[in-house]
Amino acid sequence: MEEKKRIMSGMRPTGRLHLGHYLGVITNWVKLQNDYDCYFSVADWHALTTGYDKTEQLKDNVYNVVIDWLACGIDPKKATIFVQSTIPEIAELNIYLGMVTPQNWIERDPTLKDMAKILKSKEGTNSQIGFGLMGYPVLMTADILAVNAHYVPVGIDQVAHVELTRDMARRFNNVYHTDYFVEPSPKLNNCPLLPGVDGAKMGKSFNNDIKISDDEETTTKRIMQCITDRSRARKDDLGHPDKCEVAFKYWQIFGTPEEIAQVEAECKAGKRGCADCKRQLAQKVNEHFKEIRERRKYYENHLDEVKAILAEGAEKSRAVSAKILTDVRNIIGMY
């Protein structure tokens, strides 16, 4: 049997995950775990790059991320789930990669620019980029090359983030006259982006998100805040689903083809008011997450199982990374 190709991806534990994470990342991981050797990391070192002074909730955030993953269908029997900081080999590999990476590569990397924006939004215009944040792209590459992954699942707007990893792998291979590291390719996820309730990009810091862990009441309240067709003043006004900034986009994701067609037709005919439409939408979303919430509650009440999954994942991941690091040290000629 042909050996499965390896996939590496991760998330920073900066708070509870929202529906954007669910649709944009997790549902794709659930599919990939069936056909690939998947490694999914809770990137707690990366969380420190912009949240180094706010670590009180870091451990709880790690558990909540993993619980969300498990509840949404990530299967520890199919995928390796681990916490980044439990794999010290990543940190050592980060050093070696940093030695061969030109400074201008780092400065132009979009990942660093994105992280700098996050830091600026938190600390204001006088914020200073720390050494750890400057090295974010190198550490991200170390995460990927520590398991010598073939693919990195990303959205179309993140393809450039993988290019630096490819450049670094190629640079290491050229410097040390080897072909050891795979140049990982982006594996595109074509899921449409889910906007926040205000129509902007969904994000925890924007207070426009709907969290995976939200209960029915909270989810309904948030969906009732969703922006619809701004030009529609009365219930019987003819609607324009194509101008419905949020609610109809949610219908297109959570509704059946028949339901979507009905919503569109009734809206255009002025037979469906926006408030009623959002109430029905909330029912659909709550129905979709019913089993996920039940599984989430189970893992919240069985945290020992979550810890055991992470321990097993760390052991498996370290076995792979330790072998790779030994090879890297030998290639470089370390003592």
Question: Where is each model-derived feature located?
Answer:
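Conserved nucleotide- and phosphate/pyrophosphate-binding catalytic cores
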Residues: R166-Y335
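Structured ligand/cofactor/substrate-binding pocket environments in proteins
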Residues: L17-L23, Y39, K54-L58, K77, ...
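N-terminal Rossmann-like or analogous alpha/beta NTP/dinucleotide-binding catalytic cores
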Residues: E2-T141, K297
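A generic secondary-structure signal for well-formed alpha-helical elements
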Residues: V66, G73, T101-W105, A149, ...
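Short helix-capping/linker segments at secondary-structure and domain boundaries
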Residues: Q103-E107, A146-P153, G255-V263, R293
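A broad detector of the eukaryotic-type serine/threonine protein kinase catalytic domain
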Residues: R12, H46-A47, V147-V152, N207, ...
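Short capping/connector residues at structural and topological boundaries
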Residues: R12, R16, D53, P102, ...
